[in-house]
Amino acid sequence: MGNHLTEMAPTASSFLPHFQALHVVVIGLDSAGKTSLLYRLKFKEFVQSVPTKGFNTEKIRVPLGGSRGITFQVWDVGGQEKLRPLWRSYTRRTDGLVFVVDSAETERLEEARMELHRISKASDNQGVPVLVLANKQDQPGALSAAEVEKRLAVRELAAATLTHVQGCSAVDGLGLQPGLEHLYEMILKRKKAPRSSKKRR
């Protein structure tokens, strides 16, 4: 599993006409559990993965009640320090950002905070909704979603950025469905905002 990173990455416009999917990028520090979360969503089971040295991509359909559902084209990008400069190639013009943190690895939360703020405040990502997944809630000593939100200073992100912090576990899938529902709602709200402003003119 995994592909090599390149400077050029597909954007939302290349997916929507063909798949009617929302383009979402999953990033975070190495060993946060990004790939395991991706394959929990795809296969509905826990997959022990190796560190991603490039990227993985999957199309995932999430039910929203009844027969309704939304399709996400998810890009899971490696989190090793040497790969982080390439994150922006994948987040450019994305519909939503998913930032995954290891809730039990508290000594790296400051590093995670710095990377979260750096990528979300990049000029290409201004206003892009951010879902923070506080992963590994199944592990002893894992911080709660509220504590992770505080440690990452999520509320200090730009006022125009919609955010949500969701506790989750790739092992049992806890929290993933409500997290993605929140992400979809934030993306929808952002897409509707320009239309509303035009109507008021």
Curated annotation (Swiss-Prot):
Keyword Nucleus: yes
Location(s), subcellular: Nucleus, Nucleolus; Cell membrane; Nucleus; Cytoplasm
Major localisation: nucleus
Domain of life: Eukaryota
Gene Ontology cellular-component annotations: cytoplasm; nucleolus; nucleus; plasma membrane
Lipid moiety-binding region (N-myristoyl glycine): 2
Keyword terms, alphabetized: Cell membrane, Cytoplasm, GTP-binding, Lipoprotein, Membrane, Myristate, Nucleotide-binding, Nucleus
GO molecular function annotation: GTP binding; GTPase activity
InterPro entries found in the cross-reference section: P-loop_NTPase, Small_GTP-bd, Small_GTPase_ARF, Small_GTPase_ARF/SAR
Keyword Nucleotide-binding recorded: yes
Annotated Pfam families: Arf
Annotated GTP binding sites: 28-35, 76-80, 135-138
Quaternary structure annotation from Swiss-Prot or TrEMBL: Interacts with CYTH2; the interaction is direct and ARL4D GTP-dependent. Does not interact with ARL4D.
Family, per entry: Belongs to the small GTPase superfamily. Arf family.
The protein's role, per its UniProt record: Small GTP-binding protein which cycles between an inactive GDP-bound and an active GTP-bound form, and the rate of cycling is regulated by guanine nucleotide exchange factors (GEF) and GTPase-activating proteins (GAP). GTP-binding protein that does not act as an allosteric activator of the cholera toxin catalytic subunit. Recruits CYTH1, CYTH2, CYTH3 and CYTH4 to the plasma membrane in GDP-bound form.
Stated name of the protein: ADP-ribosylation factor-like protein 4D
Originating organism: Mus musculus
Gene for this chain: Arl4d
